[in-house]
């Protein structure tokens, strides 16, 4: 299955950015200059820059663990290590056993691939408002026990009750590093046919944040461990992969990302990492929806796929992400992919600027 995924990614990205067989929609045949052969085309330059992204001969996670000599509370508590204790689940009474099982299945799939991190408790909300209030209180007692009343009346407790009021099937994760002992959790509303995928997505956030600790490196204001686009993009990519929906999702996401770039040429994933830019984007609509959502999910997924295509699925999730604990987000990215985050932003912007037909026939899907 992993081989099939990588083959699909390679084929997909080659069709979009590297194939000489795909014709431009709007481009006019360029005039050949006398020294044309001496000047690499923009496409050739892009291909060479993409090749810069590669697996490096850096120290393994085991070497980094052995060399890490800075006292760290979360590392000493095993925050970044798999646990034997199984996740717990709380569910409102109006939901069925099938709803519970779909969420349990998603978490099980996530832990099977990534390992069992936590301690984790999952809260599943239906449409009964009184039931949601009960589970909201339970959530606050677990995840915000240092400030339960505030959580219930002014913070996430309200969000949980609103899931019942509006019958939302969204989710959110909470990472309570500051508690003694620390714990993790996520909340899901009204499980439907996408429940398994959503549960995996939220569990990926649990895994990501298990490797983000309070250390010297994240005292830097601009180093949050994972850029927003990579945090959401990598969660969605792995969730789609594990439920077998990556091909269609990648094709759709690339279309959306390219249209977004065409209509908003001065907006990119790098703007998500600037707080002032982020506040502006949160008030702006793009492609009929929120700019931030498109950049984090569809565009972030394509960017993540490009990194995975140049390395591997296991390398991305099981080598790169764990290194964040010991190196911080910026250094872990650079060490893992042979390129800085800012350099990747430049390459990815050029990738989206390529004006090619992007398509993938159903016949080719079936053949793969």
Annotate each PLM feature.
Residues 2-8:
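Sec-dependent signal peptide recognition
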Residues 16-17:
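C-terminal motif of bacterial Sec signal peptides marking the signal peptidase cleavage site
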Residues 25-197, 215-216, 224, 342:
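Non-catalytic architectural context of zinc metalloproteases
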Residues 42, 46-49, 53-61, 105, ...:
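Beta/coil-rich, acidic/histidine-enriched accessory regions frequently appended to metallopeptidases
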Residues 92, 96-103, 188-200, 210, ...:
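Solvent-exposed, acidic/flexible segments
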Residues 108-116, 204-213, 239-247, 305-313, ...:
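Sec-exported extracytoplasmic/periplasmic mature domains
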Residues 165-265:
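Zinc-dependent metallopeptidase catalytic helix centered on the HExxH motif
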Residues 258-342:
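Active-site-proximal alpha-helical
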């Amino acid at each position: 299955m992993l081989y099939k995924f990588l083959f699909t990614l390679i084929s997909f990205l080659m069709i979009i950015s590297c194939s000489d067989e795909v014709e431009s929609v709007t481009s006019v045949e360029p005039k050949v200059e006398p020294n044309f052969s001496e000047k690499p085309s923009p496409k050739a330059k892009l291909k060479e820059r993409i090749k810069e992204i590669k697996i490096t001969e850096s120290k393994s996670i085991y070497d980094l663990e052995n060399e890490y000599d800075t006292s760290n509370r979360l590392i000493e508590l095993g925050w970044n290590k798999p646990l034997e204790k199984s996740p717990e689940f709380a569910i409102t009474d109006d939901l069925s056993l099938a709803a519970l099982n779909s969420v349990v299945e998603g978490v099980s799939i996530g832990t099977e691939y990534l390992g069992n991190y936590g301690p984790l408790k999952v809260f599943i909300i239906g449409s009964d408002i009184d039931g949601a209030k009960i589970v909201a209180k339970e959530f606050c007692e677990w995840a915000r026990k240092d400030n339960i009343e505030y959580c219930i009346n002014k913070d996430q407790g309200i969000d949980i009750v609103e899931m019942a009021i509006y019958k939302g099937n969204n989710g959110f994760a909470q990472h309570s590093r500051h508690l003694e002992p620390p714990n993790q959790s996520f909340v899901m509303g009204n499980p439907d046919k996408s429940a398994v995928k959503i549960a995996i997505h939220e569990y990926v956030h649990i895994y990501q944040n298990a490797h983000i600790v309070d250390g010297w490196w994240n005292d830097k204001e601009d180093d949050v461990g994972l850029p927003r686009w990579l945090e959401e993009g990598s969660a969605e990519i792995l969730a789609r992969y594990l439920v077998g929906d990556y091909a269609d999702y990648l094709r759709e996401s690339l279309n959306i990302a390219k249209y977004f770039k065409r209509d908003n040429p001065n907006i990119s994933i790098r703007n998500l990492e600037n707080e002032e830019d982020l506040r502006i984007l949160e008030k702006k609509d793009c492609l009929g929806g929120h700019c931030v959502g498109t950049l984090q999910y569809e565009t972030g997924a394509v960017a993540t796929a490009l990194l995975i295509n140049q390395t591997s699925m296991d390398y991305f999730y099981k080598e790169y992400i764990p290194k964040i604990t010991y190196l911080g987000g910026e250094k872990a990215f650079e060490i893992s992919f042979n390129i800085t985050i800012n350099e990747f932003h430049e390459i990815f912007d050029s990738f989206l600027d390529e004006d090619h037909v992007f398509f993938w026939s159903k016949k080719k899907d079936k053949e793969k």
